[in-house]
Amino acid sequence: KKNSILKKNHSWMNAIKNNFQVDDYESLIPNADLVINLTPDKEHHNVIKILQQLMKKNSCLGYSHGFNIVEFGEKIREDITVIMVAPKCPGTEVREEYNRGFGVPTLIAVHDANDIHKQGLEIAKAWSFSIGGHRAGVLESSFIAEVKSDLMGEQTILCGMLQTASLLCYEKLITDKHNPAYAAKLIQNGWETITESLKHGGITLMMDRLSNSSKIRAYNLSENIKKILAPLFQKHMDDIISGEFSAEMMKDWKNHDQKLLFWRQKIKNTSFETAPMYNKKIPEQEYYDHGILMVAILKSGIELSFEKMINAGIIAESAYYESLHELPLIANTIARKKLYEMNKVI
């Protein structure tokens, strides 16, 4: 924005420091071969409207999430190639993984209605390579499959389940007279610690961190949770496939995010979010030994979301990314600043 450039704000200073060319839309976009739109979903329509007026003929437009194309139904100029590179984690974690010499699993896709030159897939491959996605795995998908699986994962195991389980587990521990500070830390850092085993060995390795008797307890709890939550997960999947979920979300956008902001404030004021700090170190194994219910919740949530996506026609690899592989990266955000951080970056 011109105003940001004139004021030389923090983002301007950061860009200059890292040798990026900085200018406004009107100066940069007409000369660009590839324009990548990384703005929030709710801003896409207005941003794309401006971009299409400025982008040169036969250039390429990139998305990191296909909501605008699939759910809003945005139409892009026929000469513009439209691609997607969708890392399966929050943007902050893409950078973290790249900096440590790795990357995150990434879905790539080409919008069939906008691939007149048949070069979209090669551009998407190059983009995914540039952010390190090839080190973790790049899967060719479609815009619609990415959107539906992404929404299902976030609404169930990745965000919805972690948030609800954090609040319920904390309240249970407090009811049982546990130290509030310890309880909050056990849950806040427990998700990150426990899901790290998922990254290296899936549900099997996570369960192997438990004693034999604890494995049995976690398994039985998990099966009971699946029976209880199966109808709810199915409703989420049905609403996402039908478009009802997206329609309701877009209504809230038009209402200035009234529901979203109310829910965020409600979560921010919970006893879990406001719990005191626990300054002592909790040993890694203690998170497993005292987190049997958390393990059961993760197991049931992963399996349910994966099964519902498969039954809806989403390919197994994509369902896996959205139900299991992204979990540690979402859990990292909770470990930083509890649920507030997760809700802020998703």
Curated annotation (Swiss-Prot):
Keywords: Amino-acid biosynthesis, Branched-chain amino acid biosynthesis, Magnesium, Metal-binding, NADP, Oxidoreductase, Repeat. Pathway: Amino-acid biosynthesis; L-isoleucine biosynthesis; L-isoleucine from 2-oxobutanoate: step 2/4; Amino-acid biosynthesis; L-valine biosynthesis; L-valine from pyruvate: step 2/4. The active site is at residue 65. Coiled coil: none annotated. Mg(2+) 1 binds at residues 150, 154. One of its GO terms (cellular component) is cytosol. InterPro entries: 6-PGluconate_DH-like_C_sf, 6PGD_dom2, KARI, KARI_C, KARI_N, KARI_prok, NAD(P)-bd_dom_sf. Residues 142-286, 287-346 form the KARI C-terminal knotted domain. It comes from the Bacteria. One of its GO terms (molecular function) is metal ion binding. Residues 1-141 form the KARI N-terminal Rossmann domain. SUPFAM superfamilies: 6-phosphogluconate dehydrogenase C-terminal domain-like, NAD(P)-binding Rossmann-fold domains. The keyword Oxidoreductase applies. Binds 2 magnesium ions per subunit. It catalyses: (2R)-2,3-dihydroxy-3-methylbutanoate + NADP(+) = (2S)-2-acetolactate + NADPH + H(+); (2R,3R)-2,3-dihydroxy-3-methylpentanoate + NADP(+) = (S)-2-ethyl-2-hydroxy-3-oxobutanoate + NADPH + H(+). The keyword Chloroplast does not apply. Mg(2+) 2 binds at residues 150, 322, 326. It is an enzyme of class 1 (oxidoreductase). Its EC number is 1.1.1.86. GO terms for biological process: isoleucine biosynthetic process; L-valine biosynthetic process. This is Ketol-acid reductoisomerase (NADP(+)). The lineage of its organism: Bacteria, Pseudomonadati, Pseudomonadota, Gammaproteobacteria, Enterobacterales. The gene is ilvC.
